[in-house]
Amino acid sequence: VNDMKAIIDREFDNFNALKENTYGQKIVLTYQAKLNDRAAADTGRPGFENDVRLEFSNNPDHDSEGSTGYTPWDTVVCFTYKLNVYKTNNHDFKLEGAKFRMYSDESCKNEVYVKKTESGYNVINRDSTGGTDHTGGTAPAEAVEMVSDKDGNFIIYGLDGGTYYLKETEAPAGYRKLLDPIVLKVVPTFTT
């Protein structure tokens, strides 16, 4: 390219309030990745690495023609967490059949949807339901309530760091459900 400034002036006319283009600025690209169910269930690892690099054209006047270049590889490490939940009475007797839903807000309006898997319950990514993270969107068809097993236990996989509210929706026969949600804080600690 003989004159990059001429191309920028042509493509981005009057870029700022002074009708000038600013050269030499950094271009920042952001990407997002989603963990699948296998990754969500594989907690305890030192994190999941996502590698990315960008291929770009060296000739801005032509689409998909000519030589290309690459940015250096960039790596982002993400983490996921699991939670073991035990439902017992005040004498530590294990209670089967207690039903729960989890929320990301204290008023218990933004549900953290989960689906049943062989080993427990996996968090469903809200991006797939029309929301972002743990807010908004519609309930996916596979979303279920969490139910304690014969040992009073269930496991939630794929949690992000943050505060959650576990609300009992139905108590086992002969018991009353909890009056208030249980506040759960997932606070990651990283070592370097």
PLM feature segments, named:
Residues 1-192:
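Solvent-exposed loop/turn and edge beta-strand elements of beta-rich ligand-binding domains
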